[in-house]
């Protein structure tokens, strides 16, 4: 087998439709577009969501909700992620240094997901009630 001898299987490829090439082709004269009207013209079609002048669905329905801008600067850390930290004292900066949170994060909350094996000291970081109990049980403290 050589690359220059490769060919598709017989009957697997069909020739493209050749429009406007005479009556005998089956797609002559109007090229399958019918007679007149917007869709028969070149460039003639409506934009997505256009309903012929009727008020479109996305404008008939009420607006709802919004995304809080401050939410972008809040992150959650799971308990088991604190096991991987080399530092004993955990602050916002240490979490950023170890790549656990993005650089633009301003507040962090530790949630009780997974287990913590080592004693860590949280400074300036919020945590849930369950996470606080788990950290103190492991010998750490929350400040």
Swiss-Prot record:
GO molecular function terms listed in the Swiss-Prot or TrEMBL record: rRNA binding; structural constituent of ribosome
Q: What Pfam families would the database entry show?
A: Ribosomal_L27A
Q: Report the SS bond pairs.
A: none
Read off the InterPro entries from this record. Ribosomal_uL15, Ribosomal_uL15/eL18, Ribosomal_uL15/eL18_sf, Ribosomal_uL15_bac-type, Ribosomal_uL15_CS
The annotated regions of Gly residues compositional bias extend over: 21-31
Key words, A-Z: Ribonucleoprotein, Ribosomal protein, RNA-binding, rRNA-binding
Q: Which PANTHER family match?
A: 50S RIBOSOMAL PROTEIN L15 (PTHR12934), LARGE RIBOSOMAL SUBUNIT PROTEIN UL15M (PTHR12934:SF11)
NCBIfam families attached here?
rplO_bact
What is the annotated quaternary arrangement, including any partners?
Answer: Part of the 50S ribosomal subunit.
Q: What is this protein called?
A: Large ribosomal subunit protein uL15
Its taxonomic placement starts with: Bacteria, Pseudomonadati, Pseudomonadota, Gammaproteobacteria, Thiotrichales
Give the gene name. rplO
């Amino acid at each position: 087998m050589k690359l220059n001898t490769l060919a598709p299987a017989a009957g697997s490829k069909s020739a493209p439709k050749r429009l406007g090439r005479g009556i005998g082709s089956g797609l002559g004269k109007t090229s399958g577009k019918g007679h007149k009207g917007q869709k028969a013209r070149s460039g003639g079609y409506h934009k997505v969501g256009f309903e012929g002048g009727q008020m479109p669905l996305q404008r008939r329905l009420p607006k709802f909700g919004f995304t809080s801008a401050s939410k972008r600067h809040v992150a959650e850390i799971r308990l088991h992620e604190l096991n991987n930290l080399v530092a004993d004292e955990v602050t916002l900066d240490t979490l950023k240094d170890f790549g656990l949170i993005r650089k633009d994060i301003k507040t962090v909350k530790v949630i009780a997901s997974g287990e913590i094996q080592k004693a860590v000291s949280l400074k300036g970081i919020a945590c849930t009630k369950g996470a606080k109990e788990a950290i103190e049980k492991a010998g750490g403290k929350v400040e």
